[in-house]
């Protein structure tokens, strides 16, 4: 996707989903008018995000500091799980709950501040929370979330890293 500028991607994925198709069509027309047929095709392939994905994209694009903290925390959680450190897991789990709650509140605030016409009371914040929890559990999902180009919410139903740590009986 080298033909599509980062600025354009950020502009499209930070805008509310109801305006995505019109903005994408305008960008395609602009690229065609500039003689960039390959760029126009690439822009035309971009998928419209769901409202939940848009909220996560807002976090990634406008609060990269908090998203970096999420990724750091996910690495710490995986390490504590791999090393079977119960006390550390409990501490990190409390931090996880606080950070996810902060991120969900930030998503709501960003939507409300940036786009006053968005019905804040009907935002799918549970899907946002599920996506953030999935990002904590899976490295690939975390990278998708951090990209700011998510097109749909994600959930995770696993039990930790695969392969699981080798357990041994201590007598």
Please describe what each predicted stretch is.
Residues 23-65, 78-85, 91:
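N-terminal interaction modules that seed assembly of large macromolecular complexes
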Residues 8, 59, 65-171:
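Amphipathic alpha-helical coiled-coil/helical-stalk segments
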Residues 1-15, 22, 32, 165-171:
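Actinobacteria-biased recognition of intrinsically disordered, low-complexity terminal regions
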């Amino acid at each position: 996707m080298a033909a599509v500028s980062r600025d354009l991607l950020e502009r499209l994925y930070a805008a509310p989903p109801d305006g995505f198709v019109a903005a994408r069509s305008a960008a395609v027309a602009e690229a065609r008018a500039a003689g960039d047929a390959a760029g126009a095709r690439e822009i035309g392939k971009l998928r419209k995000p769901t409202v939940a994905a848009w909220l996560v994209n807002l976090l990634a694009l406008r609060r990269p500091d908090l998203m970096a903290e999420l990724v750091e925390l996910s690495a710490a959680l995986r390490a504590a799980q791999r090393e079977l450190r119960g006390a550390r897991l409990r501490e990190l789990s409390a931090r996880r709950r606080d950070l996810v709650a902060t991120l969900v509140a930030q998503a709501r605030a960003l939507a409300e501040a940036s786009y006053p016409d968005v019905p804040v009371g009907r935002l799918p914040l549970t899907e946002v929370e599920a996506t953030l929890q999935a990002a904590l559990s899976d490295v690939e999902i975390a990278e998708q979330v951090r990209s700011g180009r998510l097109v749909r919410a994600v959930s995770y139903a696993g039990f930790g890293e695969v392969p699981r740590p080798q357990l041994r009986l201590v007598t």
